[in-house]
Curated annotation (Swiss-Prot):
GO MF term set: ATP binding; glutaminyl-tRNA synthase (glutamine-hydrolyzing) activity
EC annotation from Swiss-Prot or TrEMBL: 6.3.5.7
Subunit structure: Heterotrimer of A, B and C subunits.
Lineage: Bacteria, Bacillati, Bacillota, Bacilli, Bacillales
Its job: Allows the formation of correctly charged Gln-tRNA(Gln) through the transamidation of misacylated Glu-tRNA(Gln) in organisms which lack glutaminyl-tRNA synthetase. The reaction takes place in the presence of glutamine and ATP through an activated gamma-phospho-Glu-tRNA(Gln).
UniProt GO cellular component terms: glutamyl-tRNA(Gln) amidotransferase complex
Record keywords, A-Z: ATP-binding, Ligase, Nucleotide-binding, Protein biosynthesis
Record-linked Pfam families: Amidase (PF01425)
Biological process annotations from GO: translation
UniProt catalytic activity: L-glutamyl-tRNA(Gln) + L-glutamine + ATP + H2O = L-glutaminyl-tRNA(Gln) + L-glutamate + ADP + phosphate + H(+)
HAMAP family recorded: GatA (MF_00120)
Enzyme class: ligase
Active site, UniProt feature: K77 (charge relay system), S152 (charge relay system), S176 (acyl-ester intermediate)
Gene that produces this protein: gatA
Name of the protein this chain belongs to: Glutamyl-tRNA(Gln) amidotransferase subunit A
Length: 483
């Protein structure tokens, strides 16, 4: 049994009693990385020397009994800036970018005395569902190395599933925490929009992006979200909501819980094995005293189209800052200012990023704004209202995190429409801004299936309670890939 088979609480107790040290945990992390990283490719940049230095300092000072995360190793998605540690967003254009400040979530993790093991691979600028668009390398699913780990936070999910770190941070714009968590058999939470500061998150689509935790179990996830939540003056979209003790609400009691199951989420396009795992999960929740009814989210069918217009439009604006002038890659082949812009961006961005910039610029252009961007915003309002209507009668909404299990590497990368449609069950949640968690709920042909539990605004505590109650009745979260 490895050290990372223990929970956050168990490791904290061992650290306080000095049965183990932070140095032991960092050693465990880098030993595992040395053993499996060549197979899975979770990391872009390792933080080895600094991690051991911090571990020694914490060991010498002793672990604060009230600081649950102190001394524990974490991995950070590489679109979250870390002072003096290369942050690339998995793009050539930021290949050598060395930030001069920490993201707010990184500062909070430092205050919590976690130990940053390194920066995790992702789809370039978080644009993708498979971690295949990274400039550096593809990440492989620990459960089947011929398959993708999901995306865009594929490195964050694979590192946890492979035991390279205890937990990690990802970001979720249209499913980028929940889908990889489902594909890799781990727990991933997309918080309510505004619950966690975006300051220091390299922007993709500012009205959709949200940072969240990926862990091996629900309780660990709750501890990590407690540490990174809260109002931040540096983020105008951050909301002044009290930081709850999510971990205190894991009682297992969900008697009387009312569950809505959208017919759109278990219909055409959902793999039979995925559907069966979700139906089995609903039976487990029924045994615990919950009830469920079929409901409708009628505008979900417009989710993918609306999302890719809105997200691409915001990306075309956000990514205009990468021009070769202030920081990042600068083309050596440019002789005029216009050439500098064109060549830097043409050479620095990958194909998927360029595709989305062009799509977004087109949607925002004067002749097409009303036909595309405005209509997408109107559809977003209808999608949001669907959730409001269901939450008037039901406590949570449940369905699959993804219509399929992990697909083959190179299986969809040249078919953007099929790749985009894989997000059909996750993008409506981002468009509405509500929270959702993915928890392991079974296997289909040996590959993990994720159960998506969706809540009303700022009801993460209820999501954790339901997810934890389900987890305690099953053993799926204890299953490990054979690497």
């Amino acid at each position: 049994m490895g050290l990372f088979d223990f929970s956050v609480k168990e490791l904290h107790d061992k650290l306080v009693k000095k049965e183990i040290t932070p140095f032991d945990l960092v050693t465990e992390s880098f030993n595992r990385i040395e053993s499996v990283e060549d197979k899975v490719g979770s990391f872009i940049t390792l933080n080895k020397e600094a991690a051991f230095d911090v571990a020694e300092e914490l060991g010498d000072a002793g672990i604060d009994p009230n600081n649950m995360l102190a001394g524990l190793p974490i991995g950070i998605k590489d679109n979250i800036v870390t002072k003096n540690l290369r942050t690339t967003a998995a793009s050539k254009i930021l290949e050598n970018f060395d930030p001069i400040y920490d993201a707010t979530v990184v500062s909070k993790l430092k205050n919590a005395q976690t130990i940053n093991i390194g920066k995790l691979n992702m789809d370039e600028f978080a644009m993708g569902s498979s971690t295949e668009t990274s400039y550096f390398h593809k990440t492989h699913n620990p459960w089947d190395l011929s398959r993708v780990p999901g995306g865009s936070s594929g490195g964050s999910a694979s590192a946890v599933a492979a035991g390279e770190v205890l937990f990690s941070l990802g970001s979720d714009t249209g499913g980028s925490i929940r889908q990889p968590a489902a594909f890799c058999g781990v727990v991933g939470m997309k918080p309510t929009y505004g619950r966690v500061s975006r300051f220091g998150l390299i922007a993709f689509a500012s009205s959709l992006d949200q940072i969240g935790p990926i862990t091996k179990n629900v309780e660990d996830n709750a501890y990590l979200l407690e540490a990174i939540s809260g109002l931040d003056a540096n983020d105008s979209t951050s909301i002044n909501q009290p930081v709850e003790r999510f971990s205190d609400n894991l009682t297992g009691d969900i008697k009387g819980l009312r569950i809505g199951v959208p017919k759109e989420y278990l219909g055409e396009g959902v793999d039979p094995g995925v559907k069966q795992a979700v139906l089995d999960a609903l039976k487990t929740l029924e045994k615990l005293g919950a009830t469920w009814d079929e409901v409708s989210l009628p505008h979900s069918e417009y989710g993918v189209a609306s999302y890719y217009i809105l997200a691409s439009s915001e990306a075309s604006s956000n990514l205009s800052r990468f021009d070769g002038v202030r920081y990042g890659y600068r083309s050596p082949n440019a002789h005029t200012l216009e050439e500098l812009y064109k060549k830097t961006r043409s050479e620095g961005f990958g194909d998927e990023v360029k595709r989305r910039i062009m799509l977004g610029t087109y949607a925002l252009s004067s002749g097409y704004y009303d036909a595309y961007y405005k209509k997408a915003q109107q559809a977003r309002t209808l999608i949001k209202q669907d959730f409001v209507n269901v939450f008037e009668k039901y406590d949570v909404i449940i369905g699959p995190s993804s219509p399929t299990t992990a697909f083959k590497i190179d299986g969809m990368i040249n078919d953007p429409i099929t790749m985009y449609s894989n997000d059909i069950l996750t993008v409506p949640i981002n468009l509405a801004g509500v929270p959702a968690i993915s928890v392991p709920c079974g296997f289909s042909e040996g590959l993990p299936v994720g159960l998506q539990i969706i809540g009303n605004y700022f009801e993460e505590s209820l999501l954790y309670k339901v997810a934890h109650a389900f987890e305690q009745e099953t053993t799926f979260h204890k299953e490990k890939p054979n690497l």
